Amino acid sequence: MLNFHKAELIDVSAIAELVNSAYRGESSRAGWTTEADLLDGLRTTTQEVASMIKRDDAFILLGVLNDQVIATICCERQVAHGRNIAHLGMIAVKPSLQNRGHGAVLIQAAEAIALREWRVVGFHMAVISIRNELVAFYARLGYARTGEFTDFPVNSALWQPKVTGLNLEYLAKVI
């Protein structure tokens, strides 16, 4: 069973390593959430992770199994139309431990914290639109397509697309 706690600065390297191994490169192919065929490079850096941990309007939740960080999610408080919502991102589970329910319980734990601490009225996230398996996974957790899309962000210092025309699709869950 996973135990959860909010990340601290001491966790920065472990978080960046886990997120990058789950999203990109050959190690990510051990799981079902890989972006290795879509993007080269890194998903995040230790600097980005540290800045998220330091924010008052965000937290990174860690899933720990047998004293090892195996899952992570970033939750940011935002205001949309005058209402508190939470944006979920950087959701990662160690590739060799995916498909065991850890991702679902991680998301539910982050949602519970955001509901309790921020009194949010909903959640949203962005996924690469051609990742139908991810959209289906999030749909099983109550997230629905919003019909909103945006171009995939350019960050040539970190990642390079392997395919053209990537975009992000927004999903939302109303409480």
Residues covered by each model-derived region:
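Residues that form or flank phosphate/diphosphate-binding pockets in enzymes
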Residues: 83, 101, 133
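Acetyl-CoA-dependent GNAT
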Residues: 6-12, 16-96, 107-109, 113, ...
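Residues forming the Rossmann-fold NAD(P)(H) cofactor-binding site
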Residues: 104
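C-terminal "cap" of GNAT-fold acetyltransferases
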Residues: 121-136, 140-175
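Extreme N-terminal starter segment of soluble prokaryotic enzymes
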Residues: 1-4
